């Protein structure tokens, strides 16, 4: 009988690893079993996770984990979790570009790092002015010729336009008085990306080819010129592409990526002069504690063709102000999104050559 050839010995210093056939297949089968669950059961699981302490961060990460199982679980989670306008909660990255609630503001705060010109946005987790917070976005300031740009990203360690986490940017003119807000995604179907040289994005590492990556202008922020150096606070005006405040979430879904949503015009709320303190004052309801030229409140500008719009002039849609040397609060509500509010707040940093 022929002698059986023994297996070759392992290389010197090497290790012998036992290969178990089918491990990858078992993992795939397990994932398929999760994906084969009835949609109704998936939705019920997400509802129970949300109800069992998953309403606030950090426990809300369990809801996000459900959406990470597979595509069907993600669809189920997105269907169950209501947007910020209805729930008052920020859950998924997409929530950052959806309008906030109408009845109360989303309370956030910004931390500034002067050394590297970076700004970090956090969602407040308690009623305290500043707490540990849930990180939402970051922005870094860059000087590009006569312009200043703030690149906004979901990743605090990758603040570039080529990043998968790129959200958009804010770009100023030479004077620092006029800004344009750019979104990385088209606000509606057929929107044209900016063709300026600084907005072209070479070497993009984005994975998803379904939605074009670029810079789409979605808003402007302007500060009124003050060449005579007259005494008084800054004056601001904003024009943004936002859904109407009367739009429901279902209507927003129907019209998304179909047509322009129209402009929402905001102006700063005029402060009053405090004779005793000899300064301009606004009521920030305890959310701002340090006097600063950067502090502001924005309200909807009255439409001369709509008498009812004057009633909304007293509702503060965005307020921003200083509480420490490098900490600022930022509270926003419908129709603004967290991304829009962050971009407007960033415009308050830096020197306004013609305003100060």
From Swiss-Prot:
Enumerate the transmembrane spans: none
Residue ranges annotated for the F-box domain, each copy included: 32-88
Compositionally biased region (Pro residues): 1-12
Family matches, as SUPFAM superfamilies: Tubby C-terminal domain-like
Q: Which stretches are tagged as biased composition: Acidic residues?
A: 21-31
The free-text tissue note of the record is: Ubiquitous.
Q: Where is this region: Disordered?
A: 1-31
PANTHER family (UniProt xref): TUBBY-LIKE F-BOX PROTEIN 1, TUBBY-RELATED
Q: Which family does the similarity line name?
A: Belongs to the TUB family.
The protein depicted here goes by the name Tubby-like F-box protein 1
Q: Give me the gene this protein comes from.
A: TULP1
